[in-house]
Amino acid sequence: MSDPQDRIAHVSWEEGRAANLANWEDRVPIHEVGYGVASGTIEEELSDVVTYDLAAMAPFLPGGTVDGLDLCHFQCHIGTDTVSFARAGARVTGVDFSPSALASASRLAARYGVEAAWVETDVLDAAAAVRDAVARGAAPTADFDVVYTSIGAICWLNDLDRWAAQIAAVLRPGGLFYIRDGHQAMFALDENAPDLRTVYRYFGDGSAQVWDDEGTYLGEGTVAHTRTYEWPHPLSEVVNALIGAGLRIERLDEGTVLPWQFSPRMEEIDGGYAWPGPERQRVPVTFTVVARKP
């Protein structure tokens, strides 16, 4: 698919979700090795992602910490960051659509003696699923002080209004939502071009973009289900979805350093990867939003 137009896919949410789930199921054993979960060498302290995000969240948290707070991690994958929040003192519930990922997360929590609840659901149905888990005795609470999502998350969702409604539904009054994710301005670039060249859409129109890739962002190995679908979401769509759900935006930032190597031209620096030289200041690679439920 050399032509960006060939990547446009008019698929239903159900079809796209099924393909993505198969792909993410395949990623679990690869990521267990890549993160050090399989070997037991995963860092004993906080993950790099959570270390960064906790510092960014601190000014908006009571006492500057998640200690003693109920935290729900949307799209938690194999739980490495969720377990880090538990190590920081939060009472955690992880939400993800992959049963294999949640089984891995549960094993990780047990290995380190961390208490955590895990809820299998599409994040677009998170509120009802967490309430059901509470009713079954599988989760301690359906109301949270913090809802968190970070890095490589919302591109897998087709409906941000519905996503934001789930966040608002599980937050307590005064509760905090935090997201740090890849910026759509970066995703619109050709990652293999010799310069910063926009070839994909920045704005979305409801259609997905289709990708076929046997690799993944971490670890060695290949996936059997190579096809995935992603939806572009400009920053304005993210912010307006949260406002529309009744949340108050307290902070918006854009960043130049990414926790993974989006392009082979990116340089590894302290804290992640960035474009080389003066290109670093030309386009954001991440955005961060902090919002609160009144």
How should these model regions be labeled?
Residues 69-129:
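Class I SAM-dependent methyltransferase SAM/SAH-binding core
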